[in-house]
Regions:
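Histidine-rich, glycine-flanked metal-binding segment
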Residues: 1-48
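C-terminal cap of metal-dependent C-N hydrolases
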Residues: 6, 336, 346-375
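Conserved, mostly hydrophobic/aromatic
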Residues: 44, 55, 122, 178, ...
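Di-metal (Zn2+ and/or Mg2+/Mn2+) metal-binding site signature of metallo-dependent hydrolases
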Residues: 45-67, 355
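Divalent metal-dependent hydrolysis catalytic cores, especially in the metallo-beta-lactamase
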Residues: 57, 73-102, 115-128, 155-167, ...
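Active-site core of metal-dependent hydrolases
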Residues: 153-274
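His/Asp/Glu-enriched, well-ordered alpha-helical/loop segment
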Residues: 224-235, 253-265, 271-351, 355-357
Length: 375
């Protein structure tokens, strides 16, 4: 495929007018047209890399923790239709028995239709009982090296991220023991600044949905957010314009830098569906507009009802984030954070030919996956 007359998002994080060439599913620097080859005229549209979502739970009435091929394929199809072409869905806090079924289903899945399943984000159960958010406290478990390794074996190595509250018993030891096997993220935590620093020094590199389910910043108790800033951690942001005020989103890009921010959807099964009653991690959730809350605790946000592409779009159009920065945070950064950036996350030569064409208002005009138009 050749995509002509596009404003291409380059590896230098700028836009340049030009053409994209895709051969055998991957981007090449240049190629002569072949007989019968599909040529897509972008007509001046933006050409963005296919997005990479490393933290979402569900969409279209399905949840990754359903533990079925039907659920995984539904998520893969929906995400691809929204320009998200690599997915690393997140588990919820469940028992090892339930998580076994999730890992088995993921290991059995074969890519080829819809977004590629490139990993698993193990958000629970190694989190704080005081910051469970919408996680089910019944299934909380101390950080357990053996449990992680058993699940990783069942997942055939697909677990890319494990979330840990570092102040909990055994957590720092877990980080030291496992940081060479999987990326460790600080999450759902009451940790102090000092303990967070110790966690990063032990091998953690990542912060799950920054600002949410963690202590804030004060001048005498800087907390985990300042620890993450000082240690150069990668930080996730949910930019659905519900979880975080736009000023805090801009603040994060300016302080951490757009090379350290990762946009995530953190979406639950209602994403793509009308308002109504749904569930997340076995708990009832009420969805109205972009807001999802626990039905029995209306003040507790229960994930989002917004896909990653729309989160990126809102970051630009509603929150004042430069387009170049938002695209980087939704494609290259998440790909790098889980080690798949040789294949996904940019329009560099050698990467998969995953391309979104979008107009000036960031409405999707086309989605190309590995050189084949799917939208």
């Amino acid at each position: 495929m050749i995509i002509k007359h596009a404003k291409i998002y380059t590896p230098r994080h700028t836009f340049e007018e030009g053409d994209l060439f895709i051969r055998e599913g991957r981007i090449v620097p240049f190629a002569q047209p072949e007989a019968g080859e599909e040529v897509l005229d972008a007509k001046g549209a933006y050409a963005l890399p296919g997005l990479v979502d490393i933290h979402f739970h569900g969409a279209m009435g399905k949840d990754f923790c359903d533990g079925t091929e039907e659920a995984i394929q539904t998520l893969a199809d929906f995400e691809a239709s929204k320009g998200v072409l690599a997915i690393c869905p997140a588990t919820m806090t469940f028992s090892e028995e339930i998580l076994n079924g999730v890992m088995d289903a993921a290991a059995a899945h074969r890519n080829g239709k819809g977004a590629d399943l490139v990993g698993i984000n193990m958000e629970g159960p190694f989190i704080s009982p005081k910051k469970v958010g919408a996680q089910n406290p019944e299934y909380l478990h101390p950080a357990d090296v053996g449990m992680f390794r058993r699940l990783q074996k069942r997942a055939n190595g697909l677990i890319k991220l494990v979330d840990v509250a570092p102040e909990e018993p055994g957590a720092l030891e877990f980080i030291r023991e496992c940081c060479g096997e999987v990326r460790i993220s600080i999450a759902h935590t009451c940790t102090s600044y000092n303990t967070a620093c110790a966690a990063f020094d032990a091998g953690a590199t990542h912060m799950t949905h920054l600002y949410n389910a963690m202590p804030g910043i004060t001048h005498r108790a800087p907390g985990p957010i300042i620890a993450a800033l000082e240690r150069g951690a990668e930080v996730e942001l949910i930019t659905d314009n519900v979880h975080i005020h736009p000023a805090m989103v801009r603040f994060t890009f300016r302080t951490f830098g757009d090379d350290h921010v990762i946009l995530i959807a953190d979406s639950m099964m209602a994403c793509g569906l009308p308002d109504g009653q749904y569930s997340l991690g076995g708990q009832a959730v009420t969805v109205k507009g972009p807001r999802a809350t626990l039905t029995e605790q209306p003040g507790t946000i229960a994930g989002s009802a917004t896909c990653l592409y729309d989160c990126m779009k809102r970051a630009v159009l509603e929150m004042g984030v430069p387009l170049e920065s938002a695209v980087r945070a939704a494609s290259e950064n998440p790909a790098r954070s889980i080690g798949i950036d040789n294949d996904y996350g940019s329009l560099s030569a050698g990467r998969y030919g995953n391309v979104i064409l979008a107009d000036e208002a960031l409405n999707i005009q086309a989605v190309v996956q590995k050189g084949t138009r799917i939208v």
